[in-house]
Amino acid sequence: MPIIIDKDLPARKVLQEENIFVMTKERAETQDIRALKIAILNLMPTKQETEAQLLRLIGNTPLQLDVHLLHMESHLSRNVAQEHLTSFYKTFRDIENEKFDGLIITGAPVETLSFEEVDYWEELKRIMEYSKTNVTSTLHICWGAQAGLYHHYGVQKYPLKEKMFGVFEHEVREQHVKLLQGFDELFFAPHSRHTEVRENDIRGVKELTLLANSEEAGVHLVIGPEGRQVFALGHSEYSCDTLKQEYERDRQKGLNIDVPKNYFKHDNPNEKPLVRWRSHGNLLFSNWLNYYVYQETPYVL
C-alpha cells in the first residue's frame, strides 16, 4: 500500500525509481480508507537522505500512510535549504493540537553533549510528553532512543572510548514479542555512535523490556509498556552506503576513524559494502507499523 507525500518532495523521485509505492495527497483524498497519520521528527542534518531512508521502509508495507515531516523550531538547520523546510516540514506548534497514529524520532549528531546542553532539548521534551497522550506508538532511533529512555525512564548514556561503528550481530532476547515477529534468532544491524546505554540500567527499569542486544555493540532494541514506546539504538534504516559516507566524511575532516566493522567486503574500504541488515530493517518497521500502530490505533483519533 502507498505512503502519501507531497508531489514535489525530492525523495518522491528516489522512491519511485526503487518501486516504492507513493501516492499524492490529491489522489489519496478520493479514497474512502483512512490513512494512518505518521509524523517523522527529523533531527538529522542530512534531512533529505533521512527522509528517503525512512520513507523507503515504512512504504514497504500493506498500509496507507499519511506522512507529516517535522523539524525543530528552536534549532537553526544549516545543512538544508530553508525552502525545503518551508515547503515540506511543519513544527510542533503546527501540529500540537492534532493526534497521530505513529511518531518516529530520528537520531541526531549531538550525543557527545549532555541532553540539557542540546539547544532544542526543551522543545523535544514537550514533544515526547505530547507523544504519551496524543500518539499511539512512538519509535525512537539512536540518539532519539537515548533521549527517550532518559526523558521517560531516567536511563543515562555513557561515553565510549571508541566510536561504535559498523554492522554487528544481535541476538533476540524475547522470542514472543510481536515487534520481533519473523526475526531470526541472530540478525545484523548497523551502529554509529559515540555513547551507549547499558543493559543493567535497562533491566533495572521494570517498565522496560530488552528485546535484542549484541555482545559487541550492546543494547539495540527496547520496548515500553504495551508497545507505546519503542527504542532502537542502532540504525536499521541505513542505506547501503551510509556508513561508507560517514567514514569518508570523517577521514576528509582528518578525524581518527577506524574502518566500519563487518561492513566492507574483507574489511577493505576499497571494496563494496556488504548489506546484511536490510531484511530485518524492513521487518522491524513493518512489525512496528502493523502490531503497535495499525492494530492498536482507533479509527477516529
UniProtKB/Swiss-Prot annotation:
Say where the protein is mainly found. Answer: cytoplasm
Q: Which Pfam families match?
A: HTS
List of catalytic residues: 142 (acyl-thioester intermediate), 235 (proton acceptor), 237
Instruction: Give a GO cellular-component term.
Output: cytoplasm
What keyword terms does UniProt attach to this protein?
Answer: Acyltransferase, Amino-acid biosynthesis, Cytoplasm, Methionine biosynthesis, Transferase
Q: Where is this site: Important for acyl-CoA specificity?
A: 111
Coiled-coil-forming residues are none
- GO MF: homoserine O-acetyltransferase activity; homoserine O-succinyltransferase activity
Does the record carry Acyltransferase as a key word? yes
> Which locations, inside or outside the cell, does it occupy?
Cytoplasm
Annotated metabolic or biological route of this protein: Amino-acid biosynthesis; L-methionine biosynthesis via de novo pathway; O-acetyl-L-homoserine from L-homoserine: step 1/1
**Annotated site location: Important for substrate specificity:** 192
Which EC main class describes this enzyme? transferase
Q: What does this protein do?
A: Transfers an acetyl group from acetyl-CoA to L-homoserine, forming acetyl-L-homoserine.
List the NCBIfam families.
Answer: metA (TIGR01001)
Q: Which HAMAP family match?
A: MetA_acyltransf (MF_00295)
Give the family, as the similarity comment puts it.
Belongs to the MetA family.
Q: Quote the protein name from its UniProt record.
A: Homoserine O-acetyltransferase
